[in-house]
Amino acid sequence: MNTLKNKNYYYFCKTLTESIKKNILKYPHINIIYYDNKPNISDENLQAISKFCKKYNIPFFIINNHLLATKMKANGVYLESINRNYKHLSNKKLIIVGSAHNQIEYFIKLRQKCNLIMFSPIFFNQKYSKYKTMGVVKFNLTTRFWKCKAGALGGINQKNLRNLRLINSDNYGVVSLIENKPAL
């Protein structure tokens, strides 16, 4: 982990258990993205995650809901690749992180004024087959001339942690790494 200590990690979560909290605190530059199908301000999990983030000064993002992000005083909003609206552009205080799977979605995220675009899937995981993953070389070639910061997302675990040194990015989405899921 020594060579990757100045990188930014993004963890997607619905709930926080004690083991996940301990793992989160191991990473110095971690950001938490709360995702739920229909998040609302009275959601207990959202309140608990927000409180945890404020206590430990961890940047906090809410998925696809800029109004809720401003009400909860979150640092920003995370826009999924399927989200193609432009309603969030009026709020200048929020950091906007987007997700893309190809160049077309990248250009949509650029128009949405995203500060960071997470490009996925980089490694094999349960959601994508090995034929749909891009790998290190394709990721670097695709994001080489992007006009905004790029992040790697998808399948990052203990098994392929060394490969992150080869990626031309400082931002990674790490779900499997935090939850200690075994490598496939």
Question: Where do the language-model regions lie?
Answer:
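N-terminal amphipathic alpha-helix/helix-capping segment at the start of soluble metabolic enzymes
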Residues: 1-21
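Hydrophobic faces of well-ordered beta-strands that scaffold small-molecule active sites
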Residues: 7-13, 31-34, 60-62, 77-79, ...
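Alpha/beta enzyme core
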Residues: 19-31, 67, 82, 106-119
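Generic hydrophobic/aromatic pocket-lining and core-packing "Φ" positions
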Residues: 20-21, 46, 50, 66, ...
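Catalytic cores of alpha/beta
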Residues: 23, 60-76, 101-113, 144-146, ...
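N-terminal active-site wall of soluble small-molecule enzyme domains
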Residues: 26-92
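Alpha-helix-loop-beta-strand connector modules within alpha/beta enzyme cores
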Residues: 46-61, 90-103, 131-153
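Glycine-rich phosphate-binding active-site loops on the catalytic face of alpha/beta enzymes
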Residues: 77-88, 116-133, 156-184
